[in-house]
């Protein structure tokens, strides 16, 4: 048995700090749930009375492992301590990770440890890189909690739920802040125009750039397209009826929806700027419109990129151009955001 200080649940952190400062807190022992109170383990140095609070004898509990590698056997972990994967993606009930060559023989042990560690995980997948025309993840299922093999799952981003399938359609959770900023720019554009706006995303994927706009009062219509039919299937699940969804070549979309869009989203990082000339026909005339896009460029080509965009849009149509570095892509390249406010004559 071990002595535990019984404290009000709401004051637990305060008492942990109090005990820690006095070196009275027992190491490597878990705090216990006592209903509306918590039992904080005391070491042998702690006195028999502390601020008039009850001290109770409880069977000590080991703290829950903090990382899935803590659930591997000590001998196995120590033998390959430099090689266990330290990063993974948790997408809904999927865990996706790359397995270093040195520990490939222990995929089952890795998967079992992850399933034990994370109760919400249904499937553990090895990431073998990207494949195919649409550059989707090549996933190999290592283990499934319930025997299912589907990699379709649901994620939540800024209060919106999205159906995704990383084995069939590209999705990255790492641009959530960019998507929120895009939404705010859409709100601002609607205010400047004093009316509802039409938003077009020719490279919509499963719809992460559009989900925040879906169902909002200031949005008249969403036009969404993607060349990947599997992405379009999920896109239809993620957007409401107030949208036109198709599986079309982005460069042909202006023929289908000429001069319809107020806000155009262009997220095809390796080709975004080269595709701009064929996308301009989507934008409305006689009022302000906006392009918000992302591209990967050489870090030394910032001024050249700015000049290229201006040559495509034409100076007489340009209200404002902002180019902002977002993150490094490689030692030579970076991801940028370009935001273009335009006024085309009618």
What are these regions (language model features)?
Residues 1-346:
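SAM-dependent transferase fold signal centered on methyltransferase-like domains
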């Amino acid at each position: 048995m071990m002595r535990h200080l019984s404290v009000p649940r709401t004051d637990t952190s305060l008492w942990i700090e109090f005990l820690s400062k006095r070196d009275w807190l027992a190491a490597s022992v878990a705090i216990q749930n006592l209903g509306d109170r918590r039992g904080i383990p005391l070491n042998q140095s702690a006195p028999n009375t502390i601020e008039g609070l009850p001290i109770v004898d409880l069977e000590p509990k080991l703290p829950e492992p903090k990382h899935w590698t803590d659930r591997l056997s000590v001998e196995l972990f120590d033998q390959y301590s430099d090689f266990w994967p330290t990063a993974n993606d948790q997408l809904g009930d999927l865990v996706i990770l790359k397995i270093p060559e040195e520990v490939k023989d222990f995929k089952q042990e890795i998967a079992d440890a992850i399933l034990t560690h994370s109760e919400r995980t249904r499937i553990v997948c090895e990431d073998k890189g990207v494949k195919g025309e649409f550059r989707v993840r090549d996933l190999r299922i290592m283990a499934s909690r319930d025997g299912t093999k589907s990699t379709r799952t649901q994620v939540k981003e800024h209060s919106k739920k999205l159906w995704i399938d990383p084995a069939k359609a590209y999705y990255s959770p790492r641009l959530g802040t960019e998507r929120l900023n895009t939404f705010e720019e859409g709100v601002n554009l609607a205010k400047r125009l004093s009316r509802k706006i039409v938003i077009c995303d020719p490279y919509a994927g499963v719809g992460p750039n559009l989900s925040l706009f879906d169902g909002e009062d200031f949005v008249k219509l969403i036009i969404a397209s993607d060349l990947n039919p599997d992405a379009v299937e999920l896109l239809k699940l993620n957007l409401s009826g107030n949208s036109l969804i198709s599986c079309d070549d982005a460069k042909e979309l202006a023929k289908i929806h000429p001069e319809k869009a107020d806000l155009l989203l262009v997220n095809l990082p390796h080709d975004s700027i080269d595709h701009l000339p064929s996308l301009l026909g989507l934008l409305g005339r006689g009022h302000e419109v906006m392009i918000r896009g992302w591209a990967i460029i050489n870090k030394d080509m910032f001024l050249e990129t700015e000049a290229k965009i201006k040559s495509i849009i034409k100076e007489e149509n340009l209200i404002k151009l902002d180019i902002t570095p977002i993150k490094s892509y490689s030692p030579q390249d970076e991801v940028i955001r370009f935001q273009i406010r335009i006024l085309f004559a009618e």
